[in-house]
């Protein structure tokens, strides 16, 4: 009687399969990596295909069916049949290199920082859109002197005293702790930003994808 063990079909399917994910750089580093580590330990045979996108690109990839789901940062705009669900929040700070240490002792108004060279992500990214709106709300124009493709590049450029820029606090922490960069407090506080999961309600997600979604939605995992 014990010779034949019934293995649920869902468990069989998890011996193989592929999950495709569109993810922005910030969402990858601040949220997704530890979740993927847990998923890979539980289901080592599942292949993961990860595409690095800006938020608008990730929305487009999901709409076209190139990915099973996307994980992105706000601000974002998605229409039916796409659905958005908040996963966590994060906070950006303004950072500068060693030569900017003198301006880091007290909060500064954005207007007083306009003459310093700003480093920013390229146009068409959620981060760039966020700061263009943030400056506009404070009657200013955000016109960076240097544009990069990734947040890590912003960190490197700031570290080498090429300007100041906004960066997620969690990504800057190690650099701050080592004294390689400094935080420049700003009087006009910016709102926290969210990392969100985007799915397409018209497209079914496979068993492996659903298992990964369970891990993504687990606040303790």
Where are these predicted regions, by residue range?
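Acidic, Gly/Pro-rich loop/turn segments at junctions of secondary structure
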Residues: 42, 53-116, 123, 190-191
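A late-sequence structural motif
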Residues: 31, 182-221
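Alpha-helical linker/hinge and terminal dimerization helices associated
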Residues: 1-12
């Amino acid at each position: 009687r014990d010779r034949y063990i019934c293995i649920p079909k869902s468990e069989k399917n998890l011996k193989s399969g592929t999950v495709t994910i569109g993810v922005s750089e910030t969402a990858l580093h601040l949220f997704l990596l530890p979740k993927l580590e847990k998923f890979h330990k539980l289901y080592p045979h599942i292949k993961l295909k990860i595409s690095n996108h800006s938020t608008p690109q990730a929305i487009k990839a999901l709409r076209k069916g190139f990915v099973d789901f996307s994980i992105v940062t706000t601000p974002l705009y998605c229409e039916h049949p796409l659905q958005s669900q908040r996963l966590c929040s994060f906070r950006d700070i303004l950072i500068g290199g060693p030569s900017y240490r003198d301006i880091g002792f007290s909060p500064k108004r954005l207007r007083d920082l306009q003459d310093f060279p700003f480093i920013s992500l390229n146009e068409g990214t959620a981060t760039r859109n966020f700061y263009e709106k943030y400056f506009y709300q404070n009657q200013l124009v955000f016109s960076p002197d240097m544009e990069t493709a990734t947040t890590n590049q912003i960190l490197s450029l700031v570290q080498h005293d090429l300007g100041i820029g906004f960066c997620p606090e969690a990504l800057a922490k190690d650099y701050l702790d080592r004294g390689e960069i400094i935080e420049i407090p700003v009087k006009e506080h910016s709102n926290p930003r969210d990392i969100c999961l985007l799915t397409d309600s018209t497209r079914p997600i496979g068993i492996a994808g659903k298992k990964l979604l369970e891990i993504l939605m687990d606040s303790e995992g």
